[in-house]
Amino acid sequence: MPKHGKKYLDAAKKVDSNKLYSVAEAMKLVKETSYANFDATVDVAYNLSVDPKQADQQIRGSLVLPNGTGKTQTVVVFAEGPQADQAKAAGADFVGSDDLVQKIQDGWLDFDVVVATPMMMAKVGRLGRILGPKGLMPNPKTGTVTMDIEKAVKNVKAGQVEYRVDRQAAIHTPIGKVSFTEDQLVENFDALRDVILRARPASAKGQYIKSVAVSATFGPGIKLDPLNLD
């Protein structure tokens, strides 16, 4: 068992580990149990009854949270010509081609999201070993490989988050900050819940959502009722 500090233990006392909370109760509690000395991120963890090894059960996508993420995302765009102009106009922080490839190969990673046109993916592919392990590789399923660069950049800046089932059949996604109101957190939670429900593979068996928990950075987990997420 990992040892926790006094602040964590004090926060954990507010959570009944045997209770399954409603969404509204959980969002109230996640704010109350945050003890970080910064505006902590609120994360949701879903455990699903899917087999990620099966190609048709690999759940992945993105959505724009109605109230954003509370974080300013630094966006890199690989594009040329009109698409590069679109990216700059839409507010991309860095736009380029071979110059950006070289910069990243030299160790620069001061960004949060990478967007690329399909034509640029051959060049971006050379960065697979660098971007892949950090979850930064552009992908059509998350809307980050596209010809509509303007839309992609604006979505990221508006609060787009990605969701992806991992090897343990879990999805971990941020839904905001503890400074958000309870209603804002509930609305963001609902938006993520809806896309995860819609993404249920036809071949998935049994109870699709096995468990759900929310937590603030460093804070204790708060379990929700997976059968009552309204």
Swiss-Prot record:
Record's keyword terms, sorted: Repressor, Ribonucleoprotein, Ribosomal protein, RNA-binding, rRNA-binding, Translation regulation, tRNA-binding
Example GO BP: translation
GO cellular component: large ribosomal subunit
GO molecular function, one term: structural constituent of ribosome
Pfam families: Ribosomal_L1 (PF00687)
Presence of keyword DNA damage: no
CDD domains: Ribosomal_L1
Keyword Ribosomal protein annotated: yes
Family: Belongs to the universal ribosomal protein uL1 family.
NCBIfam families, alphabetized: rplA_bact
Subunit field text: Part of the 50S ribosomal subunit.
Free-text function comment from the UniProt entry: Binds directly to 23S rRNA. The L1 stalk is quite mobile in the ribosome, and is involved in E site tRNA release.
Protein name: Large ribosomal subunit protein uL1
Source organism per UniProt: Lactobacillus helveticus (strain DPC 4571)
Organism taxonomic ancestry: Bacteria, Bacillati, Bacillota, Bacilli, Lactobacillales
